[in-house]
Swiss-Prot record:
Primary location: cytoplasm
Gene: proA
Compartmental location: Cytoplasm
Pathway(s) where this gene product acts: Amino-acid biosynthesis; L-proline biosynthesis; L-glutamate 5-semialdehyde from L-glutamate: step 2/2
Name of this protein: Gamma-glutamyl phosphate reductase
Amino acid sequence: MESLEQIGIKAKKASRYLAKLGIDEKNKALEAVADALTANAESIIAANEKDLVNAKANGMKPALIDRLTLDIKRINAMADGIRVLTGLEDPVGEVTGMKKRPNGLVIGTKRVPLGVVAIIYESRPNVTADAFGLTFKSGNACILRGGSDSINSNIAIADVIANALSDNGINPDVINLIKDTDRALVNQLMKMNDYIDVIIPRGGAGLIKNVVNNSTVPVIETGTGNCHVYVDEYADIDMAVKVIYNAKTSRIGVCNACESLVIHKAVAKQAIPLIVNALKEKNVEVRGDEYAMQCDSRIVPASDDDWGMEYLDYIISVKTVDSVDEAIEHINTYNTGHSESIITKDYNNANRFLDEIDAACVYVNASTRFSDGFEFGFGAEIGISTQKLHARGPMGLKALTTTKYVIYGEGQIRQ
């Protein structure tokens, strides 16, 4: 088995090779990878089944098993995400801001790949394909370190990708999966500044905190999702029920799922029973404050810990408020900077929410579940950044590039 240093050397060399590939070559290779994923779906599902058997034997929660599971539909979605990338404009090589200085120098910026991108992730094997597609199209080599829970699935997907690249004359070293599941290797990976340009962690709060606190390699933080939907006093109640049901129950184990409902007391007695009725169709446990419990006897008491909790389960908290100010204050206190939504017909309250909520994605009258690179038109995303430097929100191709200055002269020297 290769050492991490050997993988780093290969990836660094491959990144220089990849930076020179033209758009047509990259798109042709991506099409071949997408075709290979669908053609090898049965073998990928067979590998995934091994992971599922182990996960169930180890008592993994249903929400996490859902994240781990691959079927024909999800494999086709992975392939479609890669195909979408072929239709997107390549940001690499874009030159902007060219200006002529008084001394005759022409100075501008050129968009270039980051180099080698390492992605550390947990139980979602689709990240293997998503991460490859975005890093490859943006001219970056990748080093992938998935969780031990999904190791068989990850190996199967990475092997299919590498073989498809090789069959099409592309250096397969542009994708490097770490097959050793020893957790100590993560700490080693985080210190590989000589080979890795940036690390992107995707997973639970513990993983992200460990990488952010201990990596000497620059990190783009993808945060956990304690996402809120605020039902304003001027909300369309039917719309609120529909949006909350979708945001909470369509997929509970994802970071853009709604974990907390905030509702104005002026509409709480009318809206809460209707919302609880809908959520109970999926057996969602509803935990609320005292006023929320007065509105519906099926609500159980919430603790202070509930307000900041990312459940990833069939549980939601309900906080009642007296004003939009209180709603904004509560959300900004407990959110994780991911995705927040207001349901309202009031223009001023909508704009206040957009302006004052501190999050990567802020919605008016829509589900938080749209916080996704594919839904935003970026193709498969590398993650949703909750930090403010370099990239924020769903990260597509441009987020995986940087710029350098290009300067054209005619023999000028500095006096």
